[in-house]
Amino acid sequence: MRGIFLIRSRLSIFRAPAVKCLRFSNVLPSLSNNCIVRLYMEPPVACVLPLGLCSMFSTSIADSEQVGFTRSNIEKDDESDIDLGCSISDELVSEDVGKISKLVKDCGSDRKELRNKLEECDVKPSNELVVEILSRVRNDWETAFTFFVWAGKQQGYVRSVREYHSMISILGKMRKFDTAWTLIDEMRKFSPSLVNSQTLLIMIRKYCAVHDVGKAINTFHAYKRFKLEMGIDDFQSLLSALCRYKNVSDAGHLIFCNKDKYPFDAKSFNIVLNGWCNVIGSPREAERVWMEMGNVGVKHDVVSYSSMISCYSKGGSLNKVLKLFDRMKKECIEPDRKVYNAVVHALAKASFVSEARNLMKTMEEEKGIEPNVVTYNSLIKPLCKARKTEEAKQVFDEMLEKGLFPTIRTYHAFMRILRTGEEVFELLAKMRKMGCEPTVETYIMLIRKLCRWRDFDNVLLLWDEMKEKTVGPDLSSYIVMIHGLFLNGKIEEAYGYYKEMKDKGMRPNENVEDMIQSWFSGKQYAEQRITDSKGEVNKGAIVKKSEREKNFLQQPEVRKVVREHGYSFWDE
């Protein structure tokens, strides 16, 4: 009761008049000229793979910015490497995109047939066309690379940085790092100015995604080889990539190792702090970094508070959220929209919905910060999780009245309370009517849900719809599909999707690989045992028959007698 009383007493500040506070200004320290500490050797940049041979694909043995790292942000970051902003205004280009897309679909996984049909088609590639096709086939690296190489050989077409970056990102995502470095080397030979910091940042992100921290740092050192400057922004991009893919501890280590070259800076610490808060979700480690900032003389700013409040909000520590919120005001740091959104989420999660609504009014009327879609999502999501469907719908209607359009996250919250396959497809139809197309993540969520319900007919419908209306299933989609089918006894079907995934060059995680291989080994062993046992039975029957024939003259005739109803009969 005392805890609730303290929380409610703190909530009263939301109705109090606003206190005039000075905004905290963050001054970056001057850069030092000392060299960065070298922890690893530089990577080999130039590779000798013949790029012109489409059939030769190499495999690697290694497997001012806002910091908010959620799954959706990671996906957006991946997609930003692949140019998706290509609006096809030219009717001829749009027609050519349709032709190439049909070719790709008809050829399936037959790369040789695809190469032959591309050579026979009358399509002339352009920069716009290549970017669009690479975007559509980005989950099938062999198809993408086959098309990319074919386009590069056509007269009148010269690759730009956009196409190179898209292809490098696709290769890096599928761990074809050697081939990606070959493309970078080709860019350098064609024109040294083509290789920029964004090119190497794509490689850094892909190495971080597979947790190869050493090669990510090596690639950062390769900036000098390409005559690129290694400024504080580039260093913070490295930290951001490391934290985005859960290499947060390594990022924190780099800050201290390179303090002479890159002095302690609030933004650098905020990247690591946010990694512990929103990627790893470890309040203990986040508090350690928070204390380290104070120990080295780096002041906490609004981003620091936003990360910590978000961390406590997700963990359900409402009391700590309100303490930090009070502390911000005492230190004259004005909360921004992100802070308010996190506090709204914490209040709604703790069932203080009316207080959350009051805070939304306060931020709009007294602070002049209008609630956005994220603010309403922060309220809708915990309501849906608590099965308060009617209240969630009221908030949804209120959001529409304010002229805000729901995002994919809004609909994902409502998907958690669906109960039948019919409701799933009804919600998908409403999404499209509102102009919000489902993403691959949407289909993954629904496929997982329908597999739990053992509604496999609708699972297959969703899978086909995903293949038709999105860029196609990615690795995560296949893993969810294989798990859902396998754990529900649809083992042969799961194995079919496993083979399809392997044919596309995707690497499953160890759990899926072990699960399928164990079943496949057991299946082969069982089939072999059945074959062997049948052979032994047939062999034994032949031996017994031959022995009877051989000893027929030496043995007396033996006939069996059966008894039935008190009478004896010869056994026929």
Curated annotation (Swiss-Prot):
Native source species: Arabidopsis thaliana (Mouse-ear cress)
One term under GO cellular component: mitochondrion
One Pfam family this sequence matches: PPR
Keyword match Ribosomal protein: no
Lineage: Eukaryota, Viridiplantae, Streptophyta, Embryophyta, Tracheophyta
Compartment annotation: Mitochondrion
The organelle targeting sequence, given as a residue range: 1-57
Residues in coiled coil: none
PROSITE patterns in alphabetical order: PPR
Family according to the record: Belongs to the PPR family. P subfamily.
Keywords: Mitochondrion, Repeat, Transit peptide
Name of the protein in its database record: Pentatricopeptide repeat-containing protein At5g15010, mitochondrial
